[in-house]
């Protein structure tokens, strides 16, 4: 006996390793054969190539949408969106998280542009921001500065010039120029031209911002207050004022760095930063747009299931608005993110086992309908709706009348008639109907009173939908009133058991067109009879 036990134990130890499956490296067919221990998943490369791999299912059934990036031996970068990733064959990869804000290109007098990588299909390969020198635009021009002061003039001075942080003021050919400390005077911004002042008194400002300006500014005698401003581009011309002497700070001797312009504030000429549009110099490239200086991926509406090829015997379903239910999580085969629009951060679609059979070949009994489940088609009971009644409408308390209107849609899940409130003044002639009913457990009866009145034409409500009084006096004509026209009701309750079919025999034989008529409602209502004439209350 002891020998048999030892033999059995040895056998178990021998076969135990074979029970543990290494999912890594298994082919797609092998992985499917070892489901649910192994799970077939896909990763997407930056160039849009989908790659299938087999992974061991974790405690979350691979549902945790943990985005990670890995690189294969060939240098291809893949995005993995599941918590189940290969344990070999890939190395971790951290994508760049640089932004235009982090580069701070403006401080370097440069603009920022997002450069799209050659392959950019996933979040592992975002566009890379780069500082670039604008091809055109304002800013200091290179060259030399020349100028002269004549009688009564004041040469350029840095005494009353405030430069932005990171810049210092220096005199270049009698011009106050804000330059970087590392820049030399010879490479400072310049303006080619002349500035001449003769006598008199002139108070004003002459501002030149960016670009290359060629021309002259001459003031002769008199007293003039004014300003002259040239912004950006290339300007050729002159500005002449005849007046007296020149006193006080002016922007004529100040050349501000790129992104700034000169303003006279009090007793000082100050370089002030230009109003900056954070997206003005940001080029995000295709599929992105700029917002507050940042490039944001464009939102693209799409059906994620269009991108998925499910295994044989499975089909793709999109995530419902209420989220995934337990049966979906347990019975799924493949999980996929939504790779259109924003970065995938949730599981949007899954592949689930396809149901067996079809509802096309199933005929359910009355009161039931066919629904297709994973185990096959099932007849489920139709839940009848809670239909409103005139009692729910409270029309009378608001000075209105309640009418019951039959609906053309005859599904059991829909209310066949609905109550509405109308203004009595909208009723032509004088058509009044009263409806009474007993309790749900007793025989119901409907009493309808028709008081005929004079009608003009054929469009009045007084003759039930435009019928003449002559037509309305015919019992057979009355039968057709309830399907297409308004049926009148009061505060009586109606539902299921109170729906009855109106037979021609139910109408009293002694009915005449001028008196009240009575309809005894006894026949059971059948759905197949819905298209025939019947009354509801």
Swiss-Prot record:
Q: Where is this region: Disordered?
A: 183-246
The record's annotation in InterPro entries points to:
Dict_spore_N (IPR007643), Fol_N (IPR003645)
What is the gene name? cotB
Q: Which organism is it from?
A: Dictyostelium discoideum
PTM field = Phosphorylated and fucosylated.
DSCP-N domain mapped to chain residues: 21-140
Q: What is this protein called?
A: Spore coat protein SP70
Asked if the keyword ATP-binding belongs to this entry, the reply reads: no
Superkingdom per UniProt: Eukaryota
Coiled coil location:
none
Entry keyword set: Glycoprotein, Phosphoprotein, Repeat, Signal, Sporulation
Q: Which residues are glycosylated?
A: 97
Gene Ontology CC: glycoprotein complex; spore wall
- What GO biological process terms are annotated to this protein in UniProt? slug development involved in sorocarp development; spore wall assembly; sporulation resulting in formation of a cellular spore
Give an example GO molecular function.
DNA binding
């Amino acid at each position: 006996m002891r020998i048999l036990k030892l033999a059995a134990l040895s056998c178990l130890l021998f076969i135990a390793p074979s029970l543990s499956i290494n999912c890594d490296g298994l082919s797609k067919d092998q992985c499917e054969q070892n489901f649910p221990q192994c799970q077939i998943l896909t990763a997407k490369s930056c160039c849009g190539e989908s790659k299938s791999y087999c992974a061991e299912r974790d405690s979350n059934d691979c549902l945790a949408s943990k985005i990670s990036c890995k690189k294969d031996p060939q240098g291809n970068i893949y995005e993995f969106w599941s918590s189940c990733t290969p344990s070999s064959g890939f190395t971790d990869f951290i994508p760049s998280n640089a932004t235009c804000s982090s580069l701070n290109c403006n401080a370097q007098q440069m603009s920022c542009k997002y450069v799209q990588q050659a392959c950019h299909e996933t979040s592992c390969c975002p566009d890379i921001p780069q500082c670039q020198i604008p091809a055109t635009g304002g800013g200091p021009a290179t060259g030399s500065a020349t100028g002269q002061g004549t009688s009564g003039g004041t040469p350029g001075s840095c005494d009353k010039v405030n430069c932005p942080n990171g810049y210092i003021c220096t005199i270049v050919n009698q011009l106050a120029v804000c330059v970087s400390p590392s820049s030399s005077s010879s490479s400072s911004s310049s303006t080619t031209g002349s500035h001449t002042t003769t006598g008199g008194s002139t108070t004003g400002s002459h501002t030149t911002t960016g670009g290359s300006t060629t021309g002259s500014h001459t003031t002769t005698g008199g007293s003039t207050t004014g300003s002259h401003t040239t912004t950006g581009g290339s300007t050729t011309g002159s500005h002449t004022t005849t007046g007296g002497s020149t006193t006080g700070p002016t922007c004529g001797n100040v050349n501000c760095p790129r992104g700034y312009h000169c303003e006279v504030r009090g007793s000082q000429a100050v370089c002030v930063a230009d109003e900056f549009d954070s997206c003005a110099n940001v080029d995000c490239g295709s599929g992105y747009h700029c917002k507050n200086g940042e490039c944001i991926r464009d939102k693209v509406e799409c059906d994620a299931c269009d991108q998925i090829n499910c295994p044989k015997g499975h089909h793709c379903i999109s995530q419902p608005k209420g989220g995934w239910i337990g049966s979906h999580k347990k019975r799924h085969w493949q999980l996929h993110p939504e790779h259109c629009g924003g970065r995938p951060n949730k599981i949007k679609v899954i592949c689930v086992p396809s149901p067996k059979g079809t509802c096309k070949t199933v005929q359910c009994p009355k009161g039931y309908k066919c629904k297709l489940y994973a185990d096959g088609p099932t007849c489920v009971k139709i839940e009848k709706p809670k239909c409103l009644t005139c009692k729910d409408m409270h029309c009378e308390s608001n000075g209105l009348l309640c009418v019951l209107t039959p609906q053309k849609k005859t599904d059991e899940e829909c209310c066949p008639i609905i109550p509405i409130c109308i203004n009595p003044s909208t009723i032509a002639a004088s058509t009044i109907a009263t409806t009474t009913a007993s309790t749900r457990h007793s025989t119901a009866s409907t009493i309808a009173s028709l008081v005929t009145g004079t009608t003009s034409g054929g469009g009045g409500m007084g003759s039930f939908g435009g019928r003449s009084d002559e037509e309305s006096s015919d019992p057979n004509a009355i039968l057709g009133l309830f399907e297409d026209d308004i049926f009148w009701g009061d505060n009586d309750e109606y539902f299921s058991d109170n729906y009855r079919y109106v037979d021609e025999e139910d109408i009293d034989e002694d009915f005449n067109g001028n008196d009240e008529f009575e309809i005894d409602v006894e026949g059971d209502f059948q759905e197949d009879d819905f298209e025939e004439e019947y009354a509801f209350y």
